[in-house]
């Protein structure tokens, strides 16, 4: 109230208005609390009072009053809360999304949503009509729907309006008397005026249609005058009992102008929707009632059960027939038919829900029941006004009891079914049927059918009972039921898989060990309801794992042509492919050429080592077109000697930026406007493109126009606007630099493009030629960007020397073109070398007798440089079309791109071996063994092929691939055998083509047929037949290997059934898949129900990333009993869900191999190598079988689900079967951590006081490609808040009226207050500055302790120091009060080696505090330098914090989450000491600040050893004078003093071992600080001296390891924090 108002009130003699009111807060679980609050206090203060009164820990509460959510920043008076009013305190998360349960989000990309218009209800329909756009005013904003809103996805039409033309819910009227139509809600007189904010977008249909009924009534005298008619209608409406008072008042009437019709407008009725729990309860009621009537019908007199029992007695007594007449038999059959009709009628009634709610309200007519049952939801910008009906526990309990009663009755029927199965009733009756229709057999069939049908129904009912648990936590009765939704468990522990050095041992169910002849070890589980036409398909041969060789894909089909019919006989060799034009003979020639290449690579590999390199599992496919450009392997991009192109230039993690962040001004680029620190290639490209000058863009556009200015490229872009050109350059830079395998390579590519405009123009031209001409982006972009002096886009005339008739390479599609990637390959213009190599290969084949000796006719035609197309392409270009028609593809080259290995010296005795599990085409399986040995004849046949097995999968099965990549890169010479002469350099790393491979038996029998059987000569017909079979079999392999479609697409389900494998994918005969079908869960345990229950085993195994109802969870429905759930998680064993692995003593996984530091595997001889190959094959086959099992289990349509998505299946295989190992840097870091931890095990005390891990000296690990991210909240925000809290201590101590903290807290404040300024207290929040402050003031503090606490005495004994510390520490009553305020904490806990030995909590807390005080007293007596003194101070404080943390950890049963919750009770206890009462202002802010300190403490100090803590308590209880300083001095101080006696110790050498160049200066003076020392920590419990991480000076360790016999908590972020 203002002063003027107060004077007027006093002048009038009116009493003063009250300034405080009493408000009652009520929660959803019926807890109430009455608080007193001022009218000018905020709603947030009211929430805080309610949380404190009801002991609510979470901070997501809102106040609801008058049907609306109050703003927390409003005052109580402004919110309209009066004295004595009751408001609701509810839990609501920070996100306001999806406060309505059943909302269908707008996910249509095209249409838009009209925003709220003042004066009209907020619209929500999606208008797709073009005419509607003309009706919208010009000033109305039409925003696009938000893309990040996550609503509960519910199908918009849950109940159809009609089924087969019959209305379901719509009322039917007589069209002769009543005219029915629907009009928009806008324009009606009852339309409310609800202004909406312009920025709020609605996503629900808040503008419904108005159903208008026009009743034609004959005009009569009884309706005159008109006012009498209106009065009659009004009175009739008011007397209707089923209308509410608000509805009666909202009725409006209006006559038309002629007073011939009266419009009666009823107000909209707010809908009542059931809660999820009530929906489940009603379904359970409906099915329970159905189950009761079902059992009654079966058990009625002379019913189905009686007939079944009669048949059972006949079977037991072996009575074959009864002497019944035919009429009696027919009567029994008719009686059974009547039972079937009645049961089917009962099942048909399940399609309509009964009105159980009406029955419940009749039984319970109290206001309390109605208030709990119906909950009103006010209108919001997203939701209309509606009511939600809840399920109450009193309703659930009765339904549960009735269901269990009927379930026991049904159990007796199941026992009868088991009796029939035991005696074989069906077989007995079926064998003795004498009539056409036997009533006995029909009775058994009916009983079997309906019992199984009801079993499935009961399984759903049993599942619903788990969702309707009555909570036992809240004592109120009755109470609402919240369903047990599934939730994502926060399991931060990574899954540890026991592996050997290289390969993971296979699982028992998929292990091929001990199998013979390729038996499939495990029969995959097929979910129920799999369609029989899928199961009964024709068997197909499983593809066996083979090594890949140089090959090209076999054409998909061969067609009989005119040339095949020669002389009345069929010539299979003339069969041609209609797409590529190849014949079988051409394909065989191409395969023979590759076999020659294989033989040429055979010699010189004996005695070599095997090096395992990581290869990606996917393929990159590229084509080169008609005139492929020959890329040039060149030097790295140009650069100065001081800054070479391939080395790291700066340590600022910036992309080619000088330390001053200003780029040089060049002819092409403008200077850097701001400091650029890009994190992704797209941002790099946009930043670089923003610097392009206008004249440079014009020059590039002109160059590109010139390059394309010919017949085939008539594209002029030089007239484009600058903004378009800049975007084009940005996109080109992004795509071109993405070709790099690493970040450094991408940086080099960006440098080369920026420094030379000609390089950029040439690269864009080549890529556009490949992209627009053939639809594929080239994979050799890196070699296009970095040439030496020759252009890569020149015309190359490849001549066909393999084909006799064809001399021009443009029309010869079977020629194999290789893209050279080695400097030894012919360069761009060296066409003579290309012709010589091909002529030599042709001569080699003629000498081997593989092809007839004919002369080749090389072409001498010269073609101009530039893109080349044939005559058809030129015609298309003239017509304005791109050359992308339906003509067959030109010469295609498939490249398998892998990251380039590190450069090493060539050695012919080194073998680079790559094992990959992928889906490629395969070569003969005998090929790896032939490559691994020396001097193996080329005619050696491989082992027999794998047998054909039945594959239920309608999709290709999983295959395995071994890629034996021969390369000459090694830095270690062979030791076992002398090195043979080095062979001629070959293009071993060149991209290889892909061919469909022959079978094992037919791979090399054409090479030299006389070797195996000299006297045998095969006929041409036999050779042709064998080759045709070989090609057909290779075609099947090729189709299965290259299949990359969507498994969910039914058009690809079975390519071997009608309408045939050659049917186009867009053929209308192929069945399409509905988009709205749900995706089947990956783990098919209970596949017939889509379950979202949090107890469901499907969710526990699959752990989905987002559940269907995940956005509407409340705290009660997520975790009704959080402590009990945490208790269960602590007791659950940490084991894998997958099948167990094979025994560790298996001979294939029980040996060791040699591994170098660089990751290479070294073998002494071939005897060591052969077991390794066997292990590799065994592991690979097991992985293939696991993947095949996942595919088989998830690719079939089952009831209610469609086949799983192909991409999701691949993700499952990658994540759960073939897990990608970590990077080498990560593995090395973990190995270093393990070695450091092992070194510190000799000193238990050093485990607690260990320091950060020393950085490795390996230069490859000196700079990470991606700098580690900084958690701004943990590293900046929270330490800043803690610094403000420490600064507040100065203000607190300045006021003498504030109570002084007792014990250790007052002791520390007395030492620091008066010496440390506010800035010094703020410096204590971070480690780097806290050590500086301690080193500056440690001498003064130690002198103060000697003068005031030790009375100037020195040389005190340990017992005397202990006595002084006991007097300074808090007494046991201080800790007893804290324990009395927290009843959930135990008063004692076990410790030591004997678990029957208990210690009192109060006593242990006090001993920990005494130990810290005694450490400070001891330090004041020692003559130490500043560095050692600060080190001992930090170690003592760390020990104090560790021990208190372990105390809470023990009291909370080693539950980390519960420990963090209980530690916040310290904040409440401090608040009671500080404020002495709970209603003081500012107490909530005080508690929140200290809660942040507790969270920071528990998160930082996670790596502790319980063994050291037990040792401390045992020593103290035994009477030993424990002194941390004496113990640490004996271990660390004496060696340090001895080593530094000859040279004075500096703070930089004694305080920190990671940052040796950091001078001990205050960090506010601008000195440089090392990143490794920047750990922001704080010492809780008001220590004020160190709040650092436990990682201190001497010992070196990290990670989440605890010592043996201890079980300290660990989180995923511990290693990162400790390394910092």
Swiss-Prot record:
Residues 852-871, 1225-1242 have a biased composition (Polar residues). GO terms for cellular component: BAT3 complex. One of its GO terms (biological process) is signal transduction. Residues 21-96 form the Ubiquitin-like domain. Residues 1537-1556, 1583-1620 have a biased composition (Low complexity). Residues 621-648, 791-810, 842-874, 950-1016, 1219-1260, 1537-1620 are annotated as: Disordered. Residues 799-810 have a biased composition (Acidic residues). One of its GO terms (molecular function) is misfolded protein binding. Disulfide bonds: none annotated. PANTHER family: LARGE PROLINE-RICH PROTEIN BAG6. This is Uncharacterized protein ZK688.5. It comes from Caenorhabditis elegans.
């Amino acid at each position: 109230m203002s002063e003027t108002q107060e004077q007027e009130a006093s002048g009038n003699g009116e009493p003063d208005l009250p300034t405080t009111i009493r408000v009652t807060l009520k929660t959803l679980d019926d807890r109430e609390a009455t608080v007193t609050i001022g009218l000018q206090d905020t709603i947030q203060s009211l929430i805080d009072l309610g949380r404190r009164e009801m002991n609510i820990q979470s901070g997501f509460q809102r106040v609801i009053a008058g049907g609306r959510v109050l703003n927390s920043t409003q005052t109580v008076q402004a919110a309209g809360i009066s004295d004595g009013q009751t408001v609701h305190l509810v839990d609501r998360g920070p996100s306001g999304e999806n406060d309505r349960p059943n909302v269908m989000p707008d996910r249509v990309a095209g249409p838009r949503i009209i925003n709220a218009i003042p004066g009209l209800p907020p619209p929500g329909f999606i208008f797709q009509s073009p005419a509607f756009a003309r009706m919208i005013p010009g000033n109305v904003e039409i925003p696009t729907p938000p893309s990040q809103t996550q609503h509960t996805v519910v199908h918009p039409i849950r109940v159809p309006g009609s089924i087969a033309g019959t209305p379901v819910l719509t009322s039917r009227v007589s069209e002769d008397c009543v005219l029915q139509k629907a009009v928009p809600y806008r324009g009606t007189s009852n339309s409310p005026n609800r202004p909406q904010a312009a920025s709020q977008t609605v996503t629900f249909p808040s503008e419904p249609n108005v159903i208008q009924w026009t009743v034609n009534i004959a005009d009569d005298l009884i309706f005159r005058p008109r006012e009498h008619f209106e009065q009659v209608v009004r009175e009739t409406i008011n007397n209707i009992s089923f209308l509410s008072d608000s509805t009666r008042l909202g009725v409006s009437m209006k006559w038309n102008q002629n007073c011939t019709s009266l419009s009666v407008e009823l107000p909209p009725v707010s809908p009542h929707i059931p809660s999820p729990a009530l929906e489940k309860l009603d379904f359970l009621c409906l099915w329970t009632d159905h189950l009761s009537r079902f059992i009654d019908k079966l058990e009625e007199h002379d019913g189905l059960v009686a007939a079944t029992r009669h048949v059972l007695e006949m079977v037991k007594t072996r009575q074959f027939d009864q002497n019944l007449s035919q009429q009696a038999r027919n009567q029994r059959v008719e009686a059974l038919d009547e039972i079937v009709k009645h049961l089917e009628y009962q099942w048909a009634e399940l399609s309509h829900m009964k009105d159980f709610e009406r029955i419940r309200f009749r039984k319970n007519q109290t206001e309390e029941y109605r208030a709990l049952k119906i909950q009103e939801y006010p209108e919001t910008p997203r939701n209309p006004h509606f009511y939600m009906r809840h399920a109450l526990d009193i309703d659930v309990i009765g339904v549960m009891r009735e269901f269990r009663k009927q379930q026991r009755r049904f159990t007796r029927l199941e026992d009868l079914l088991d009796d029939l199965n035991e005696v074989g009733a069906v077989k007995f009756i079926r064998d003795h049927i004498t009539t056409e229709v036997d009533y006995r057999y029909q009775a058994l069939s009916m009983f079997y059918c309906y019992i199984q049908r009801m079993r499935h129904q009961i399984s759903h009912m049993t599942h619903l009972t788990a969702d309707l648990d009555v909570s036992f936590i809240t004592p109120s009765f009755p109470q609402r039921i919240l369903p047990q939704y599934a939730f994502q468990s926060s399991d931060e522990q990574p899954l540890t898989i026991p592996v050997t050095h290289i390969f993971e041992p296979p699982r028992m169910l998929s292990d091929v060990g001990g199998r013979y002849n390729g038996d499939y070890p495990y029969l995959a589980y097929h979910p129920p309801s799999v369609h029989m036409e899928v199961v009964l398909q024709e068997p197909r041969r499983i593809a066996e794992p083979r090594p890949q060789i140089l090959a090209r894909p076999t054409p998909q089909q061969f067609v009989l042509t005119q040339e095949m019919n020669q002389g009345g006989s069929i010539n299979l060799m003339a069969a041609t492919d209609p797409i590529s034009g190849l014949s079988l003979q051409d394909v065989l020639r191409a395969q023979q050429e590759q076999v020659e290449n294989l033989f040429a690579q055979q010699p010189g590999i004996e005695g070599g080592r095997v090096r395992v390199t990581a290869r990606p599992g996917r393929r990159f496919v590229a084509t080169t077109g008609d005139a492929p450009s020959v890329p040039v392997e060149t030097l790295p991009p140009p650069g100065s000697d001081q800054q070479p192109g391939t080395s790291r230039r700066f340590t600022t993690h910036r992309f080619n930026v000088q330390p001053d962040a200003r780029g040089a001004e060049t002819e092409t680029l403008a200077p850097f406007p701001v400091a650029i620190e890009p994190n992704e290639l797209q941002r790099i490209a946009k930043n670089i493109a923003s610097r392009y000058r206008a004249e440079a863009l014009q020059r590039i556009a002109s160059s590109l126009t010139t390059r394309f200015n010919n017949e085939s490229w008539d594209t002029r872009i030089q007239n484009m606007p600058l903004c378009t050109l800049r975007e084009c350059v940005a996109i080109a830079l992004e795509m071109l630099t993405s070709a790099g395998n690493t970040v450094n390579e991408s940086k080099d590519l960006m440098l080369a493009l920026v420094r030379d405009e000609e390089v950029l123009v040439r690269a864009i031209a080549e890529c556009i030629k490949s992209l627009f001409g053939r639809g594929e982006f080239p994979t050799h972009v890196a070699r296009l960007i970095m040439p030496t002096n020759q252009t890569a886009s020149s015309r190359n005339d490849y001549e066909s020397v393999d084909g006799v008739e064809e001399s021009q390479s443009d029309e010869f599609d079977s020629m194999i073109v290789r893209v050279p990637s080695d400097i030894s390959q012919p360069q761009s213009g060296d066409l003579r070398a290309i012709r010589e190599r091909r002529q030599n290969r042709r001569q080699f084949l003629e000498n081997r007798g593989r092809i007839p000796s004919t002369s080749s006719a090389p072409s001498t035609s010269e073609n101009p440089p530039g893109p080349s197309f044939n005559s058809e392409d030129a015609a298309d270009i003239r017509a304005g079309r791109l050359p992308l028609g339906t003509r067959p593809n030109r010469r295609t080259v498939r490249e398998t791109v892998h990251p380039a290995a590190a450069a090493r010296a060539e050695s012919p005795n080194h073998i680079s071996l790559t094992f990959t599990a992928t889906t490629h085409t395969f070569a003969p399986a005998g090929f790896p063994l032939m490559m691994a040995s020396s001097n193996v004849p080329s005619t050696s046949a491989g082992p027999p092929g794998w047998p054909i097995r039945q594959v239920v999968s309608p999709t290709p099965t999983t295959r395995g691939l071994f890629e034996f990549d021969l390369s000459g890169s090694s830095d270690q010479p062979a030791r076992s055998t002398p090195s043979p002469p080095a062979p001629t350099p070959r293009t071993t790393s060149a991209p290889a083509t892909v061919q469909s491979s022959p079978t094992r038996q037919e791979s090399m029998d054409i090479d030299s047929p006389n070797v195996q059987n000299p006297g045998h000569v095969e006929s041409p017909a036999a050779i042709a037949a064998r080759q045709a079979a070989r090609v057909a079999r290779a075609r099947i392999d090729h189709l299965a290997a290259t299949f990359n479609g969507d498994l969910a697409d039914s058009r690809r389900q079975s390519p071997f059934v009608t309408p045939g494998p050659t049917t186009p994918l867009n053929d209308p005969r192929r069945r399409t898949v509905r988009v709205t079908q749900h995706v089947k869960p990956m783990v098919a345990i209970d596949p017939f129900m889509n379950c979202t229950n949090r107890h469901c085993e499907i969710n526990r195994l699959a752990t989905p990333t987002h559940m269907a109802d995940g956005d509407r969870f409340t705290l009660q429905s997520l975790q009704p009993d959080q402590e009990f759930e945490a208790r269960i998680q602590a007791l659950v064993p940490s084991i894998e869900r997958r099948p167990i692995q094979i025994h560790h003593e298996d001979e294939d996984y029980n040996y060791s191999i040699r591994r170098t530091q660089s990751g290479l595997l070294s073998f002494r001889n071939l005897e060591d190598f052969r077991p390794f190959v066997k292990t590799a094959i065994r592991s690979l086959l097991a992985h293939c079988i696991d993947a095949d099992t996942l595919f088989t289990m998830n690719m079939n349509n089952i009831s209610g689900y469609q086949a799983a998505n192909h991409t999701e299946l691949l993700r499952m295989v990658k994540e759960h079967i073939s897990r990608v190992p970590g990077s080498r840097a990560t593995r090395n870091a973990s190995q270093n951590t393990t070695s450091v931890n092992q070194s510190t095990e000799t000193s238990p005390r050093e485990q607690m006081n260990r320091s950060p891990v020393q950085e490795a000296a390996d230069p490859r690990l000196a700079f990470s490609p991606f700098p580690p991210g900084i958690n701004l909240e943990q590293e900046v925000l929270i330490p800043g808040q803690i610094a403000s809290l420490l600064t507040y201590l100065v203000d607190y101590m300045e006021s003498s009226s504030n109570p002084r903290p007792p014990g250790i807290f007052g002791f520390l404040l007395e030492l620091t207050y008066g010496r440390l300024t506010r800035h010094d207290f703020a410096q204590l929040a971070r480690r780097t500055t806290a050590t500086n402050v301690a080193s500056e003031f440690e001498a003064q503090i130690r002198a103060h302790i000697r003068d005031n606490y030790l009375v100037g005495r020195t040389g005190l004994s340990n017992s005397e120091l202990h006595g002084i510390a006991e007097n300074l520490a808090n007494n046991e009553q201080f800790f007893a009060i804290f324990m009395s305020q927290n009843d959930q904490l135990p008063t004692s806990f076990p410790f030591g080696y004997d678990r029957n030995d208990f210690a009192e909590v109060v006593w242990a807390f006090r001993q920990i505090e005494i130990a810290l005080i005694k450490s400070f007293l001891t330090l004041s007596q020692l003559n130490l330098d500043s560095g050692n003194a600060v080190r001992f101070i930090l170690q003592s404080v760390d020990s104090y914090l560790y021990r208190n943390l372990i105390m809470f950890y023990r009291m909370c049963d080693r539950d980390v989450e519960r420990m963090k919750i209980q530690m916040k009770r310290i904040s409440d206890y401090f608040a009671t000491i500080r404020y002495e009462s709970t209603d003081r202002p500012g107490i909530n802010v005080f508690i929140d600040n200290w809660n942040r300190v507790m969270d920071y403490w528990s998160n930082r100090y996670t790596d502790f050893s319980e063994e050291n803590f037990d040792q401390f308590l045992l020593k103290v209880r035994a009477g030993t004078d424990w002194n941390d300083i004496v113990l640490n001095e004996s271990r660390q101080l004496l060696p340090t003093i001895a080593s530094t006696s000859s040279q004075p110790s500096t703070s930089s050498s004694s305080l920190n071992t990671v940052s040796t160049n950091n001078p001990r200066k205050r960090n506010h003076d601008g000195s440089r600080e090392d990143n490794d020392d920047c750990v922001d920590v704080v010492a809780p419990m008001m220590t004020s001296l160190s709040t650092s991480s436990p990682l201190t000076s001497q010992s070196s360790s990290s990670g989440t390891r605890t010592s043996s016999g201890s079980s300290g908590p660990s989180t995923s972020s511990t290693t990162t924090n400790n390394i910092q």
